[in-house]
């Protein structure tokens, strides 16, 4: 079948069904509304997770197509968090008729611990509330699980992540 464990093969499903606290006053959050902000969000994500070189090139090569998809799909919303006017964190959410799925978020290392991610969770909660959704749901790995727990998310299930080595673009643990 070709299925192999992902680099981080275990995660938990988490849900937030009560309003999170606000982000700090020093953090401004805005919806990504321009191609430039979208490119900034890609760079933040890549740098935050230690990706560069080929990974960054591939992400930037897909950027225009992804930007057009984001612009034309109101169900997916991207946010940037700024401190002192500088983008330091990014996060995405997908809105469905029954809830909101948080799709990743990342904060540049120098800004960690300053509330940017907390502010992004609150922004996505506020958007969910505006749309009539009652909860936020996410898949959390080892890095994000304790952060999300501090923000009020609770664990609801265990997830084992497998990749199909035969699928285009699939990268397993041996791919580094």
How would you name each of these model-derived features?
Residues 44-56:
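Helix-loop element at the rim of GNAT/NAT acetyltransferase active sites that forms part
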Residues 104-109, 113-126, 130, 145-146, ...:
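Conserved acetyl-CoA-binding loop-helix of GNAT-fold acetyltransferases
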């Amino acid at each position: 079948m070709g299925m192999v464990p992902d680099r981080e093969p275990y995660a938990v499903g988490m849900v937030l069904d009560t309003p999170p606290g606000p982000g700090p006053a020093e953090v401004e959050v805005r919806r990504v509304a321009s191609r430039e902000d979208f490119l900034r969000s890609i760079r933040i994500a890549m740098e935050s997770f230690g990706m560069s070189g080929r990974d960054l090139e591939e992400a930037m090569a897909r950027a225009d197509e992804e930007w057009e998809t984001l612009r034309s799909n109101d169900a997916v919303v991207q946010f940037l968090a700024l401190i002192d006017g500088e983008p330091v964190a990014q996060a995405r959410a997908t809105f469905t008729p029954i809830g909101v799925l948080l799709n990743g978020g990342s904060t540049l290392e120098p800004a960690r611990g300053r509330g940017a991610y907390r502010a992004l969770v609150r922004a996505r909660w506020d958007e969910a509330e505006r749309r009539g959704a009652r909860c936020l749901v996410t898949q959390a790995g080892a890095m994000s699980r304790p952060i999300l727990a501090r923000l009020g998310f609770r664990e609801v299930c265990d997830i084992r992540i497998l990749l199909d080595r035969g699928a285009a673009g699939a990268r397993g643990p041996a791919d580094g």
